[in-house]
Amino acid sequence: MADDYLVRIGKLIRDARQHRGWTQSQLAEALGTSQSAVNRIERGNQNISLEMIARIGEALDSEIVSLGYAGPMHLRVVGGRRLSGSIDVKTSKNACVALLCATLLNKGRTVLRRVARIEEVYRLLEVLGSIGVRTRWINDGVDLEIVPPAQLDMEAIDAEAARRTRSIIMFLGPLLHRMDQFKLPYAGGCDLGTRTIEPHMIALRRFGLDIAATEGLYHARVDRSVSPARPIVLTERGDTVTENALLAAARHDGVTVIRNASSNYMVQDLCFFLEALGVRVEGIGTTTLTVHGVPTIDVDVDYSPSEDPVEAMSLLAAAVVTESELTVRRVPIEFLEIELAVLEEMGLDHDRTAEYFADNGRTRLVDLTVRPSKLEAPIDKIHPMPFPGLNIDNVPFFAAIAASAQGKTLIHDWVYDNRAIYLTDLNRLGGRLQLLDPHRVLVEGPTRWRAAEMMCPPALRPAVVVLLAMMAADGTSVLRNVYVINRGYEDLAERLNSLGAQIEIFRDI
């Protein structure tokens, strides 16, 4: 039990340090100790006194623990409050994790601007650090610098961190250019049913990659005599599948054509980044990508990921569900046009500014103002489609929006095996959602939300939807174990509080 306690304390200290934007060396200097001692503390391999915990908390401006048992993070939500004001959309979580994987292609220094400080990014940084990549937060913890070693140490990979993120699968594309064989832990992430790497392998086998899965590890081998002689046709127009194919093609010495490619926002951001690395990519924004690879990439690059359309949709949904007037700034409009068209059909009162460019110089942004509206259920069902259709990740938000509208709305979440089931958690808060089958939910509105205490759904977007409903419900709700939300959103509770919400973060004591 004592060892388990030290591990939990160590993780809390590590998270607080990363949130502050400090390295282990910086914390060690503030404490007057060594970096190796801080490393042992964070790994749970060092006995630590309450006095030292207090000193660390003071140095990091964070209460590491209160007296009692340290446990997962929870949210206490006082609902029924209107939001107001304006808020900027953060950079894309899905783009940032793809770009972090893409830095493995480059021998030079990479700086990524305004990187989302979320658990998914932290886990990837832990994995990168464990194999020898030097990363540090710069410019007051806003930007991220990545410098790779001459040789990666894959034997030292942090398997625990790797298994807590699905993004680790995107190491396959870059690593096949750096070594002839390697091992990679099984990917984890949020629980969205059975996932398979076969769509990835259909693309990556064309570059000579072969994988055997044994004992929780992918054992990868690369046959250098194999290369794609004809276009690669993806059997699944998935985002990470397309990204893996792009990462493999980037350092292939030749031209690679990828068909049935995703043209979603994070794929486009990755293409823009590859162009900054000197890789020419034709067809960006279409389903056919032509990649002119280069065998060696050794450049110092500075890149600004674009804003996150799914976070923008989250904030728009927060305004709708709480019947608030809210301005959401820096919205990547190209990736929300279908969603806004559906909301307009439902009766949403909103306006938008003229378009302007994101810091990457390519993505089109607008500022959106949403006002309280009397919504009607849409005539057609809500269902996702590959871009430019309604984004898969935005489907859950329509459950809360439909529950606020007059009438019945059919939501068909055909992509995932069980995400629709998690949406029925809204019934605990007064919703009227009927699960027709594992993929279809019938939502009846409007809803008089009521407060409740419940566990956080294990899938990211449904978890946020539950939080939004709690914000609309009169009374005090508790959402327990919100790690999955922290995987995809930076300081969401604090940012919603800045708009008028009342959300308290706490841990069991």
PLM region spans:
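A detector for short, charged/polar N-terminal pre-domain segments
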Residues: 1-8, 74-75
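Short basic helix-loop element that most often maps to the first helix and adjoining turn
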Residues: 11-30, 55
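Short, structured segments at the rim of ligand-binding sites
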Residues: 15-16, 35-43, 47-59, 63-509
